[in-house]
Every structure is written in structure tokens, then in C-alpha cells.
Amino acid sequence: MRGRELPLVLLALVLCLAPRGRAVPLPAGGGTVLTKMYPRGNHWAVGHLMGKKSTGESSSVSERGSLKQQLREYIRWEEAARNLLGLIEAKENRNHQPPQPKALGNQQPSWDSEDSSNFKDVGSKGKVGRLSAPGSQREGRNPQLNQQ
């Protein structure tokens, strides 16, 4: 055996020879079935009290401070809710106002009927009923349409 393996063998030997017993000793009276099942107490209560830590200061002092803080936060939220409600009501009142009447006699059409020089008569070129791609009427692309 080498020098490094000797401590491991001794540790294994000690662990094998150690007496095996209960993890938690039971009271001498034997106790009830529940104490045998849950020797460390009721798990429901343990789970609910796990985060609770005791502090040196009185709880009434901290409760008064937290109550004041809660009241301040409540008042702030109440004011914010009032402001939001006022904004919503103002927006609804603005939307429900009737539109202002406009003068109907002075309206100008959105297009000028006299300026029709920008419109081209595309149907007179080429054969009727024949469709072509946009821009295909340029010279060089479709020679039969360019002849007239």
C-alpha cells in the first residue's frame, strides 16, 4: 500500500465498525405515534416559522412606524388614483364635445378640374384588352406598342 491510500482505508474501517443507531433519540416514555413520525415537531408549524427571527426592539415601536408608513403610502396611492380619474374624465369630456360647425360654401375640391394636363390617355396606345407590366410602354421594351 502506498502512503496516500492508508488514511482512506482507516476511515472506511472506522465507519464500518461505528455503531448504527437512531438519528434522533426518542424520549424514554416512548411517546405517541406522531412523535415517532415527526420527532422534531409538526412540519406545518416549522415551515411557517422558518423566516421569523426575533429582534431586540419592541414590536409595538416598529408597528407604529410601519403603520405611519403604510398610511403615507395609502394617501399617495389615493391621490394618484384621484389624479388619474380626473385626467380620464377630462379626456372623455373633450372627446364628447360636438364638432365645431364649418363654413360649407367656401370649400375647394381636393383636385383641380382645370389642371388635367398631368393625366395621360394610356388606352389610346396599343391594342385594347392587352395588359402589360407597368413601365413596359417605354421605347425598347415593347416595340409594337410604340408604333402608331
From Swiss-Prot:
Renumbered to this chain, the signal peptide range is 1-23
What do the Gene Ontology cellular component annotations say? extracellular region; extracellular space; neuron projection; secretory granule lumen
Q: Which UniProt keywords apply?
A: Amidation, Cell projection, Cleavage on pair of basic residues, Cytoplasmic vesicle, Mast cell degranulation, Secreted, Signal
Positions of modified residues (Methionine amide)? M50
Q: Where are the transmembrane segments?
A: none
As recorded, the propeptide runs across 54-148
Question: What is the annotated localization of this protein?
Answer: Secreted; Cytoplasmic vesicle, Secretory vesicle lumen; Cell projection, Neuron projection
Name the Gene Ontology biological process terms. Answer: mast cell degranulation; negative regulation of voltage-gated potassium channel activity; negative regulation of voltage-gated sodium channel activity; neuropeptide signaling pathway; positive regulation of behavioral fear response; positive regulation of peptide hormone secretion; positive regulation of phospholipase C-activating G protein-coupled receptor signaling pathway; positive regulation of respiratory gaseous exchange
Describe the function of this protein. Answer: Stimulates the release of gastrin and other gastrointestinal hormones. Contributes to the perception of prurient stimuli and to the transmission of itch signals in the spinal cord that promote scratching behavior. Contributes primarily to nonhistaminergic itch sensation. In one study, shown to act in the amygdala as part of an inhibitory network which inhibits memory specifically related to learned fear.
Q: What is this protein called?
A: Gastrin-releasing peptide
**Which organism encodes this protein?**
Homo sapiens
Q: Which gene encodes it?
A: GRP
